[in-house]
Each structure stands twice: as C-alpha cells, then as structure tokens.
C-alpha cells in the first residue's frame, strides 16, 4: 500500500504495539456536476489503487463501501512563467466512492445565507434608497398620456 514502509526499531518487551500510518492522503472534494446522493468524490494520491481506497475508508473510518471508480485528471501546460517557460500543473487522481447499505452523503453548508436585514445608516441601505429614487425619477410621467419626453415643451 505505501511506497516504503519504515518499521520502528525493535525494543525489548512484549507486546510490540504497531501503529500503521499510511503515507497517502485523501481529500474530500465538492463535485462539479450533480452526483447521486450515495456517491462521494475524493482527490487521492497517484500511487493509490481502488483496493487502497476501499481499505482506507473501511478500516480507518469504518465507512462501508460498495464500489470504487478512479480516473486520472491530466492537467494542462498552457500557462507560462515569467521566463516564458511552460509550467505544467501536476496531474492527480480522482476516486468516486459509492457508499453501501443505502447510505447517503450531503456536503455540509459551511457558509449559510445570511438575512438581508441591513443596519440603519449602512451603505447597503443608502444604496437601496438611491436606487429607489432613481427608479422613481426614470418612470414616465402618467400625465403625458404615453407621449415620449422627446416631444417636450
């Protein structure tokens, strides 16, 4: 699973408790397109396999996994640096994990919409008042009977 496993030095005494810490990282990503509620998208290391992703989630986080699909996202090299050399962003692997047993996942709403109540004397209130005055001023005069202002007196 890991590229190179470094075991701790042997020390006298039993039992030897071994803690396995994987060198991989998985980043939970908000999907760009709408996905089923039981599918979760991760950005993973290029060295990880489908079995690694499944074991990572099931053994460490106790999340039941039904299926894992992966793809490699190749990044472009169209950007140029200050020396006019092409700069390529690193490629990454994306894993789509389908949860088992009718489980669903919904991204938490970290930044909820705040109420539109503005404070008295605030910039937003002054802007709204100005815009309302402009709308009133630009309304056609009802006494003119539909004649445009171009035919003014």
From Swiss-Prot:
Basic and acidic residues bias (residue ranges): 111-146
* UniProt subcellular location: Mitochondrion
Keywords from the UniProt entry: Mitochondrion, Ribonucleoprotein, Ribosomal protein
Source domain of life is Eukaryota
Gene Ontology MF term list: structural constituent of ribosome
The similarity annotation says: Belongs to the universal ribosomal protein uL23 family.
User: What does the annotation say about its assembly with partners?
Assistant: Component of the mitochondrial ribosome large subunit (39S) which comprises a 16S rRNA and about 50 distinct proteins.
Protein name stated in the entry: Large ribosomal subunit protein uL23m
């Amino acid at each position: 699973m890991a590229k190179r496993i470094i075991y701790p030095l042997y020390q006298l005494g039993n039992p030897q408790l071994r803690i396995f810490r994987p060198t991989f990282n998985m980043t939970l990503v908000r999907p760009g397109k709408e996905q089923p509620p039981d599918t979760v998208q991760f950005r993973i290391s290029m060295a990880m396999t489908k079995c690694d992703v499944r074991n990572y989630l099931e053994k460490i986080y106790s999340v039941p996994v039904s299926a894992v699909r992966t793809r490699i996202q190749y990044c472009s090299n169209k950007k140029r640096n200050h020396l006019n050399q092409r700069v390529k962003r690193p490629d990454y692997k994306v894993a789509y994990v389908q949860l088992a047993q009718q489980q669903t996942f919904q991204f938490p709403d970290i930044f909820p919409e705040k109420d539109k109540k503005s404070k008295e004397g605030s910039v937003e209130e002054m802007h709204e008042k100005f815009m309302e005055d402009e709308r009133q001023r630009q309304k056609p005069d009802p006494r003119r009977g539909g004649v445009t202002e171009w035919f003014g007196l």
